[in-house]
Regions:
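Conserved active-site and SAM-binding loop architecture
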Residues: 1-133
């Protein structure tokens, strides 16, 4: 039927209580009262944006994986564009830039090719910050 996780009923309900509490605490503000925009690069499913929306920011995400973008759009107020970012990608005006560039080019678990790795997103991230300043 499914994979057995080895949780007792008490463990399961403790996790569910915690999950419910966190979801309530991080519920995005519908009115986005701060009138400030956050651009989330390499947004994934929107974990960083979730915190900013909970604080009242408007968010705009950019993510190349369709499944992650769909999750972002399903759970957050802001939009998420599905596209592969480039150094010259245009972004909307924003007061804050956040994101999670891929770590594989620098991770000790990989080949550490750095700037030679095609997945290196740091130049894109830095370019966005410079242009949005």
């Amino acid at each position: 039927m499914g994979k057995e996780l080895g949780l007792t009923r008490i463990d399961y309900f403790s996790c569910m209580d915690y999950s419910t509490k966190i979801n309530e605490e991080l519920k995005p503000w519908v009115d986005n009262t701060l009138d400030k925009t956050v651009v989330d690069l390499f947004a994934g499913c929107g974990g960083l944006s979730l915190g900013f929306e909970a604080a009242g920011f408007k968010t705009v995400g950019y993510e190349m994986l369709e499944d992650a973008s769909e999750t972002y759009r399903a759970n957050l107020i802001g939009d998420c564009f599905t596209e592969k970012l480039h150094v010259d990608t245009e972004f909307p005006k924003a007061e804050v830039v956040i994101g999670g560039p891929p770590c594989q080019p620098f991770s000790v678990g990989g080949k550490q090719l750095g700037l030679k790795d095609a997945r290196d997103g740091f130049p894109i991230f830095l370019s966005a910050i410079e242009r949005l300043e």
